[in-house]
Amino acid sequence: MQTLTVDLGDRSYPIHIGAALLTRADLVLPHLAQKRVMVVTNTTVGPLYLAQLKAALEAAGVRVAEVVLPDGEAYKNWETLNLVFDALLRERAERKTTLIALGGGVIGDMTGFAAACYQRGVPFIQIPTTLLSQVDSSVGGKTGINHPLGKNMIGAFYQPKLVLADAATLGTLPARELSAGLAEVIKYGLIWDVEFLAWLEANMDRLRALDAEAISHAIYRSCEIKAQVVAEDEREGGLRAILNLGHTFGHAIETGMGYGAWLHGEAVAAGMVLAAETSQRLGWLGEADVARTRALIRAAGLPDVAPNLGVDAYLEYMGHDKKVEGGKMRFVLLKKLGEAVITDAVPADVLTAVLTPPH
């Protein structure tokens, strides 16, 4: 097992990364305010992992309640969130009752948001079971739900007490979901660490084959970069926005196609290609850099061509982006591979050219 710390002063918390951590109640117990939890999971992950987590906690004397939600991005909304509140109220959950998110990014985001809201804030723990949630969404305290007009538009910054990333759960992950997670891993190389990017190019086959050593390294390095960025800028006042490479375009793809049609990682992958092409048109990246980005995204089994929503639709959806400031869209682009920049100075003709097929 490897451990990282997200350094946020008295709200710091550990990220434990390893195999067979799901049954390690000894890792969970120190972070419980009372021996009482509510596990939030979904209809896919619950049948696979809920029983063993519950048994381990109950054997340690913890009272465990559960709520099982429908699976999918299409359910990341108020109606589903209310099912969590219904369960908490039925169980008479208290302010010291800990919520445990057992699932991927949707479950983690909704559980964290429920924890931030219920009785104005109860503790929660992240047990991410997808690669995307293990390397990205479980770390850093972004929680929330979608709105028909925009992804993740309703939410809160609310940090977990613990992140438990059990790489063994990736064994049941469909190949498409694994690839979606690799998009966020690639993102860290593009924005922060060109050596990690080169390592990903050399090891993509191992990662897709779930080679234990390769997967552990990818999770650790991704979390290490994210923890460093979040520690410097928890609430996305500046630096943290670089973690959104590909997300301005990607969120527009998800909204425009209908939540769940494209997985988040797939939309981000295509969005990162659009960001690379924009960076090239601004004179920052060379043609070879864009080709290298595309090739790695394809090697991960991800789309490198964005859907044709039409320029106007893209601009409409991107106008709802959370990085918009003073009515101006702000983009995360690449000064070079391994170095991101945030800018609002993207000329309209450049955007139009990038968003007009063929890409």
From Swiss-Prot:
Listed GO cellular component terms?
cytoplasm
Q: How is the cofactor bound?
A: Binds 1 divalent metal cation per subunit. Can use either Co(2+) or Zn(2+).
Entry's localization field: Cytoplasm
Enzyme Commission designation = 4.2.3.4
**Keyword set includes Transport:** no
Name its co-factor(s): Co(2+); Zn(2+); NAD(+)
Q: Which top EC class is given? A: lyase
- Pathway in which the depicted protein is active: Metabolic intermediate biosynthesis; chorismate biosynthesis; chorismate from D-erythrose 4-phosphate and phosphoenolpyruvate: step 2/7
PANTHER family reported in the protein's UniProt record? 3-DEHYDROQUINATE SYNTHASE (PTHR43622), 3-DEHYDROQUINATE SYNTHASE, CHLOROPLASTIC (PTHR43622:SF7)
Q: What does this protein do?
A: Catalyzes the conversion of 3-deoxy-D-arabino-heptulosonate 7-phosphate (DAHP) to dehydroquinate (DHQ).
Q: What is this protein called?
A: 3-dehydroquinate synthase
Q: Which organism is it from?
A: Thiobacillus denitrificans (strain ATCC 25259 / T1)
